[in-house]
Amino acid sequence: ISDIVDYARSGADRPLVMCEYNHAMGNSNGSLADYWAAIEREPLLAGGFVWEWKDHGLRQEVDRKGSVNGSTWRYAYGGQFGDQPNDGNFVADGLNASDLAPHPAMRELAWVHRPVAVVADGDRGFAIHNRRSHSGTSDLRGTLTLLVVGEVMHEEEITVDVPPLASVQRDYSSALIAALNNAS
């Protein structure tokens, strides 16, 4: 990450788009939040491509012992068809399985790429950060929920139009503060 930040601060005259910067094999694609904190902080960092979207396994019929042509199936890859040479399990490296069922890393990617971030701002309120670059948040609605030991004590809808790439501070409502005081 320090290398891309160094590039962004080097006086370069063109943006950097990373290719295959975050290899998704297994659960190996950590550091996404760190990458995107740098990308959002540095104007010359224009994002990147995660390698890769989907596993390349093919459906293969097998029996309970794993022998081909049985009563069940698996996603086969890399030599499981008798092919030589092959890439082994190196083709099972996607954010999604071959049937597009998401792997756990997809949840992290969705969180890091969320269009709006809401962050507590001390004990008085919160900040809403619009991470979209071309539209405000007037098309979105949020819900502020106060939970105490898993029980909903207060809930209210939040609608606020935050301009593209901007932040808005909001104070907690008097109703929320009253609910919080009653819960203590």
Task: Locate the predicted segments by residue.
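Extended substrate-binding grooves/exosites of carbohydrate-active enzymes
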Residues: 1-123, 127, 132-138, 145-151
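Beta-strand-rich binding/interaction modules
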Residues: 125-173, 181-184
